[in-house]
Amino acid sequence: MGIARILSAVLFLSVLFVVTFPALLLADHHDGRIDTCRLPSDRGRCKASFERWYFNGRTCAKFIYGGCGGNGNKFPTEKACMKRCAKA
């Protein structure tokens, strides 16, 4: 009975590790959300031409957004980009 209990605990901890470790790698350390400011600019899959702003690791820069898809690192204004991504 002792071995079964140990194996059960090891299995539980292994599953817990496999489930939580990838989330820890992708999470923003401040609030648990994925840090969208670290994502690359992404035009998306559509062919429109909207001016948007993305954070490039140092500052906010313009890029052309296709109108659909893409990722969260797109903002309607430079001010919105800086507010979300610039570190004080």
Swiss-Prot record:
Pfam families: Kunitz_BPTI. Disulfide bonds join C37-C85, C46-C68, C60-C81. This is Kunitz-type kappaPI-theraphotoxin-Hs1e. Expressed by the venom gland. Negative results: the recombinant toxin shows weak inhibitory activity against Kv1.1/KCNA1 (59.2% inhibition at 10 uM). It does not show activity against Kv1.2/KCNA2, Kv1.3/KCNA3, Kv2.1/KCNB1 and Kv4.3/KCND3 channels, as well as on calcium (Cav) and sodium channels (Nav). It also does not show detectable activity against trypsin, kallikrein, chymotrypsin, and thrombin. One of its GO terms (molecular function) is toxin activity. It comes from Cyriopagopus schmidti. Toxin with unknown function. PANTHER family: BPTI_KUNITZ INHIBITOR DOMAIN-CONTAINING PROTEIN, KUNITZ-TYPE PROTEASE INHIBITOR-RELATED. GO terms for cellular component: extracellular space. GO terms for biological process: envenomation resulting in negative regulation of voltage-gated potassium channel activity in another organism. Residues 28-33 form a propeptide. Residues 1-27 form the signal peptide. CDD domains: Kunitz_huwentoxin. InterPro entries: Kunitz_BPTI, Kunitz_BPTI_sf, Prtase_inh_Kunz-CS, TFPI/VKTCI-like. Belongs to the venom Kunitz-type family. 02 (native) subfamily. The record marks K47, A48 as: Reactive bond for trypsin. Keywords: Disulfide bond, Protease inhibitor, Secreted, Serine protease inhibitor, Signal. Residues 37-85 form the BPTI/Kunitz inhibitor domain. The record marks L39 as: May bind Kv1.x/KCNA.
